[in-house]
Every structure is written in structure tokens, then in C-alpha cells.
Design a protein with these regions (language model features):
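A short, basic N-terminal segment
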Residues: 1-57, 80, 415
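Mid-core helix/loop region of P-loop NTP-binding domains shared across ATPases and GTPases
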Residues: 2-7, 12-17, 21, 26, ...
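Conserved C-terminal helix/linker of AAA+ ATPases
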Residues: 268-292
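AAA+ ATPase "lid" subdomain C-terminal helix
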Residues: 249-255, 263-276, 316-319, 337-338, ...
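Short alpha-helical segments that sit at the start of domains
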Residues: 291-323
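Terminal-proximal interaction/regulatory segments of ATP-powered molecular machines
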Residues: 319-415
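Conserved catalytic segments around the Walker B and adjacent sensor/switch elements
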Residues: 59-61, 84-101
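Walker A/P-loop nucleotide-binding motif
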Residues: 55-80
Length: 415
């Protein structure tokens, strides 16, 4: 007789899992059809189609909150574009670059060259280090000469290259002067405030498109389509599905949250050895997901937003209203910057970053009037524990060494 295995003690191993195809529960998986995004996709296709005829198009910018289907839509379009180009016997490269993982000018251009290599094997890829920026751009220019038509370049999360210490203006200006059609995707329309005049003149944002948040019904449709392929028949209670959609709608209509929630609920049902996903499993999943969501939200912050979290945390205890005033938060933020030999952004720009923190549910803001002559301000409170802020920012320092000099000394001072 064989020895018992420790994994046999886990209930989910004693029966078949509810999940039969986990890829449909992965937020990175893009199905062939996107529910409730046909109108937006057709609109973008109309803007891009002239490229197939050798025509020049204006830069395209896609705005929208997280999880609104922006990246998924442009991924679907890119897949179909490549198929059409092949059918026409043409060579028009399509490159996707996520600026969150490629924040430096060097890494973006190198990644672009790697993408171009998929369309032409004569492409030269710069080394990971060792070239000057001038050499990298010269290599890109020579690579583009291999194509008769301008390339299409998708810069996803373009706002990331305009974070402090990153010269997004140089990147965008130099790319827009080459034979390239640029498509930008961002959660932050405010990134345009960081553009200098010459960069703005090259990118007039005439072709700007907004993706709205999904509502609860739309999210339920998205989940239903995925559940058809992800789970065994009749393994999801309809009430549980609607509950997932409703919770995600409350979190800003983010489809990724809805999908993650359904996946977590399925795993919870498996752990309980249940053959059906019920509302109680969704409730347990939401508790786990909220912890994960905070970590993910903080992981997406740029250096300014990260320092702002620290400034709010430091200012809040000294306020009479249990919350920090905007002006006081700005003063603390500016002091942190000067202490680290960095020039702070203007208060107007900081308000934009505060709105981003609120959108990620990391802070709450409410207007406060102090009577005649007292003026108005916003009262700001963290919605997460101080310990969570510190731990999450320490993780960012390990992952992104360039944040260390600005954030770590301040983190250490308040531990």
C-alpha cells in the first residue's frame, strides 16, 4: 500500500474542481469578443483603418478608469489588424508596450525594437545596457527603415513615463517625430498637464476616446460569458454571480475585480468541497480580495502618489477633524521633497494625484467649509491602516530601486 500524501488531506483534492478551464478566470486573458465594448472597438477601428491604405493618422489617446476594457479592446484590435495586414500581403508592424514595466526611455525603445523583430528578422535589438540614448534611438531609426509603412506603437499606461524623475516628454517627442502612429492608453487624463509645449504640439489629442466604467448588469454579462467556459455546468448560483457583479460595480465598475472575485469564490467553494459557488463564498472572497486590491493599488502608484500617502499618514494625527486638510498635506509633501533634494510639484498638480488615490480607494476626501471668510478645503483620510501603507511601500522600494532615495528615509523615520 502506498503512503498517504499530505495533499490528500485538502478537500479540493478529494473531488473534481469546479474549475475546468482556469484561463477564463485570468484577468490577462482576452476573449475573442468583448461584451459591451463593440461600439468603442468599432470607433477605434475607424480611426486606425486608414493606416491600411498608407494614410497618416493623428495620435490616438484612450482614457478610462481601471478595468474598463481599454487594454483588452486594443489587444483585440491589434490581433485583427495583424491578420488583415497579412491577408493584404503588407508589412505594417504593430507593437504593444506597457509603460508600467518599461518606465525608462532606454527600456521603452529597446522593447519597441524587440516588438519590431516579430515582423522583420533584420531588426537589431540594443543590449540591455551599454548604449547611450542617442545610440538607442539611432538603432530604432535604422530598424524602422526596414518597413515601407509607419509602425503602430501602443503605449499602455503612458502616464507612468511622466512620473517624477522620468522624462516622458523626451520619449514622446522623439517617438512622435519618427514614422510611427502612436496609440496611448491611460487611466489618468491629467498626464497631459506634464507635457511641455513642443510635445503637446506633436500630440494634439484630437483623437481622444473615453471608455466608461461597466455597470452591474454589464459586469454580470462579462462574468456569465467567462463562467460558461471556466466552470462545470450548473456550478455557479445565479445569486452569487449577481453578487460578484454588484460588488465590483461598487468598486468603480472594474471588470478585473469582478473576474478576480469570481475566481476567488470558486477557489473558496473548492476548499469547502462544495459543488456550487454560493454568495457566502463570494463574501469570503471579497475579504481576501480587498487585501490584494490594496497591495495592487499601491503597486501602481508613482513616486509622487507614494509620497503623498506618507504625507497624509503623517499629517492626519495632528488635525482636529480626524482628517488632514489639503493645504497641510501639501506642506508635508513639499517638506519631504525638499528634504530629499527634490522639487515638489505644484499644489494644483497634487490635487490631481489626490483624486487618483481616492479613485483607488486608498483615501477618502470630502469638502469642508469653515464659514464666512474661513474658506473651503478638502478633508483627507486614509482608508487603509498605516501599517499597510508602510509594508506596501517597502515592497515597492525593493521592486523599484529608483524610489529608494525618496521614500525609504521617510519610511524609516516613522516606523
Amino acid at each position: 500500500m502506498s503512503e498517504p500524501n499530505i495533499f490528500d488531506r485538502i478537500p479540493s483534492q478529494a473531488k473534481q474542481s469546479i474549475i475546468i478551464d482556469a484561463k477564463y478566470l485570468d484577468t490577462k486573458f482576452v476573449p475573442d469578443e468583448l461584451p459591451h465594448r463593440k461600439e468603442q472597438i468599432n470607433d477605434l477601428v475607424g480611426l486606425i483603418a486608414p493606416v491600411l491604405k498608407g494614410q497618416t493618422i493623428q495620435p490616438i489617446t484612450i482614457y478610462g478608469p481601471p478595468g474598463a476594457g481599454k487594454t483588452a479592446a486594443i489587444t483585440c484590435i491589434g490581433k485583427e489588424f495583424k491578420r488583415k495586414v497579412a491577408a493584404l500581403g503588407k508589412q505594417i508592424p504593430w507593437a504593444n508596450i506597457n509603460c508600467y514595466g518599461n518606465t525608462s526611455e532606454y527600456s521603452i525603445i529597446r522593447r519597441f525594437c524587440c516588438e519590431l523583430e516579430q515582423s522583420n528578422k533584420n531588426i537589431v535589438i540594443p543590449p540591455e545596457t551599454g548604449y547611450s540614448i542617442t545610440q538607442v534611438y539611432a538603432t530604432l531609426e535604422r530598424n524602422l527603415e526596414n518597413f515601407k509603412s509607419p509602425a503602430i506603437l501602443v503605449l499602455d499606461e503612458i502616464d507612468q513615463i511622466f512620473s517624477k524623475k522620468r522624462d516622458g516628454n523626451s520619449t514622446l517627442y522623439r517617438l512622435s517625430s519618427m514614422p510611427i502612429h502612436i496609440i496611448s492608453i491611460t487611466n489618468e487624463p491629467s498626464f497631459r498637464e506634464f507635457l511641455d509645449p513642443r510635445t503637446r504640439s506633436r500630440n494634439n489629442f484630437a483623437n481622444s476616446r473615453i471608455f466608461p466604467s461597466y455597470n452591474a448588469k454589464e459586469l454580470a454579462d462579462i462574468l456569465s460569458k467567462r463562467a460558461e467556459h471556466a466552470f462545470r455546468p450548473d456550478s455557479v448560483d445565479s445569486g452569487a454571480m449577481q453578487y460578484c457583479a454588484a460588488l465590483a460595480a461598487q468598486k468603480g465598475g472594474d471588470a478585473r475585480i469582478a473576474i478576480d472575485l469570481l475566481r476567488f469564490a470558486a477557489q473558496e467553494a473548492d476548499r469547502e468541497d462544495s459543488s456550487t459557488i454560493l454568495e457566502k463564498h463570494v463574501k469570503c472572497a471579497m475579504e481576501s480580495l480587498e487585501v490584494s486590491m490594496v497591495a495592487q493599488a499601491i503597486d501602481q502608484l508613482d513616486i509622487t502618489q507614494s509620497v503623498l500617502l506618507l504625507a497624509i499618514m503623517d499629517t492626519q494625527p495632528y488635525q482636529n477633524y480626524g482628517a488632514a486638510r489639503t493645504g497641510d498635506v501639501y506642506e508635508t509633501y513639499a517638506n519631504i521633497c525638499w528634504r530629499n533634494k527634490e522639487r515638489p510639484l505644484t499644489q494644483r498638480m497634487i490635487v490631481t494625484h489626490l483624486n487618483t488615490l481616492e479613485k483607488y480607494h486608498l483615501i477618502s476626501m470630502r469638502a469642508k467649509s469653515f464659514g464666512r471668510g474661513g474658506g473651503r478645503t478638502s478633508l483627507i483620510k486614509l482608508t487603509i491602516p498605516n501599517k499597510t501603507v508602510i509594508e506596501s511601500l517597502e515592497n515597492k522600494i525593493r521592486d523599484y530601486p529608483e524610489l529608494k532615495d525618496v521614500i525609504k528615509p521617510y519610511v524609516e523615520s516613522i516606523l
